[in-house]
């Protein structure tokens, strides 16, 4: 199809320690993988690294208007704001998958098996360790990851 895809190696699945249905979570260890499914003609917003007020890393999947937006403006300590705190990319209005990795201060988002990719750094506050489904009905799987090392 003339597109360049970027996707993690299959061996990353070896890091999966637990598997549960994707849902709101009050607390995580901030080391996890999400495999999400979004229906065509849908709009969903999730907040990762979320605190009790729902502030964190916002990901808005707007398939109706053909756009995915990542907003880190409420995800902990801010830096490099002169370069902006949001990133967007166009996306087709079709059934869509998103594989998301959170590793404390790093996020990676792979849309449709790597057709579109977001990577970034955030520095969440200590209480920003939840997951919030803010709107829509994304479905999928939550995997807690274990790197075999102690995390803070």
Explain the meaning of each model-derived region.
Residues 1-152:
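Beta-rich accessory regions
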């Amino acid at each position: 199809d003339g597109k360049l895809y970027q996707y993690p190696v299959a061996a990353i699945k070896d890091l999966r320690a637990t598997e549960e249905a994707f849902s709101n979570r009050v607390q995580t260890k901030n080391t996890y993988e999400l495999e999400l499914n979004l229906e065509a003609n849908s709009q969903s917003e999730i907040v990762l690294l979320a605190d009790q007020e729902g502030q964190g890393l916002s990901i808005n999947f707007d398939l109706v208007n053909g756009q995915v937006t990542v907003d880190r403006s409420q995800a902990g300590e801010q830096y490099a704001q002169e370069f902006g705190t949001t990133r967007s990319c166009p996306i087709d209005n079709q059934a869509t998958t998103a594989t998301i990795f959170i590793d404390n201060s790093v996020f990676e988002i792979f849309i449709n098996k790597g057709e579109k990719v977001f990577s970034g750094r955030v520095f969440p506050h200590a209480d920003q360790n939840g997951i919030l489904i803010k709107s829509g009905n994304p479905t999928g799987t939550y995997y807690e990851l274990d790197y075999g090392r102690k995390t803070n």
